[in-house]
């Protein structure tokens, strides 16, 4: 059995009181998961700065390792750079999530960035299911998400993007969010999406982007071509949960994309959870066991 390696490093500085503290402008986290006779174990966990794994859990089966990624400062400000890398070895299965919403604050003239790189081996599975992301006024954000899958690997990736907090009366009146996502399987590019949204621009209201809504949830599943009956049921159930927003699902060969547009992060969370509960058993042959952290 390969043992867990856990390394960490950090940059500190001394404030006027002589107390050392983190400079959290850069943070990196690297994880690896390995199959050990039917049990998925985290065999690498290295971090630089305030990105960490809180704990690993097995709420459903030893074959599926749930890991909670934590960014202790609680929010990202201008100049911060987060890099997350995860590798899931052959036959292993990992689910990665976060303990709460990710918050991107005012840029102060500096770009904030997050780069996620995920690699999944043969007959392995990965679920990337962070909780919602909130962009506050004057945020300047660039997000990059790259997934590399073996020819028979399976993947579910979800995200909820909130532009402002409408429930608190906080709108996204200034700022910019750029995003790029790519998914490859067996060396072939299956999915590529990129775009940039500028607050108050026409792109925020385009039917090709947010269509005037402030919350966007996307769930992508790779690894199986769903039949027509399943897709119709998914569309009907998802639309019923949209509550005044919009919902849809599209199958492109072995890539299923489901999306919600609305004004409620709470509705988006419910929509995402239900869509995942519907898709996961079909793709992963496992019932959807909700991560415990989602209920806290």
Curated annotation (Swiss-Prot):
Keywords: Chaperone, Cytoplasm, Nickel insertion. InterPro entries: UreD (IPR002669). Pfam families: UreD (PF01774). GO terms for molecular function: nickel cation binding. Its main location: cytoplasm. GO terms for cellular component: cytoplasm. It comes from the Bacteria. Transmembrane segments: none annotated. It is found in: Cytoplasm. Required for maturation of urease via the functional incorporation of the urease nickel metallocenter. UreD, UreF and UreG form a complex that acts as a GTP-hydrolysis-dependent molecular chaperone, activating the urease apoprotein by helping to assemble the nickel containing metallocenter of UreC. The UreE protein probably delivers the nickel. Belongs to the UreD family. This is Urease accessory protein UreD. It comes from Janthinobacterium sp. (strain Marseille).
């Amino acid at each position: 059995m390969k043992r867990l390696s856990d390394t960490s490093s950090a940059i500190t500085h001394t404030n006027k009181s002589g107390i050392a503290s983190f400079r959290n402008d850069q943070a990196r986290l690297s994880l690896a998961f390995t199959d050990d006779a039917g049990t998925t174990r985290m065999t690498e966990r290295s971090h630089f700065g305030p990105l960490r794994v809180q704990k690993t859990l097995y709420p459903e089966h030893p074959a599926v390792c749930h890991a909670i990624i934590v960014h202790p400062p609680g929010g990202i400000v201008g100049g911060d750079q987060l890099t997350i890398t995860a590798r899931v070895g052959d036959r292993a299965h990992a689910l990665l999530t976060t303990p709460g919403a990710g918050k991107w604050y005012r840029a102060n003239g500096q770009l904030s960035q997050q780069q996620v790189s995920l690699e999944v081996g043969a007959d392995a599975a990965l679920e990337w299911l962070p909780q919602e992301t909130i962009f506050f006024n004057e945020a300047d954000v660039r997000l990059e998400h790259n997934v590399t899958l073996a020819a028979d690997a399976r993947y579910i990736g979800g995200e909820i993007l909130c532009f402002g907090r409408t429930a608190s009366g906080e709108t996204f009146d200034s700022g910019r969010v750029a995003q790029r996502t790519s998914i490859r399987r067996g060396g072939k590019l299956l999915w590529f999406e990129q775009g940039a949204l500028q607050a108050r621009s026409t792109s925020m209201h385009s039917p090709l982007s947010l269509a005037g809504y402030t919350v966007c949830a996307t769930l992508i599943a790779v690894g199986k071509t769903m039949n027509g009956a399943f897709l119709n049921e998914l569309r009907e159930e998802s639309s019923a949960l949209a509550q005044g927003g919009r919902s849809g699902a599209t199958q492109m060969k072995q890539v299923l994309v489901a999306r919600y547009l609305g004004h409620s992060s709470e509705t988006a969370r419910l929509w995402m959870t239900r869509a995942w509960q519907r898709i996961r058993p079909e793709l992963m042959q496992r019932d959807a066991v909700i991560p415990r952290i989602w209920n806290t």
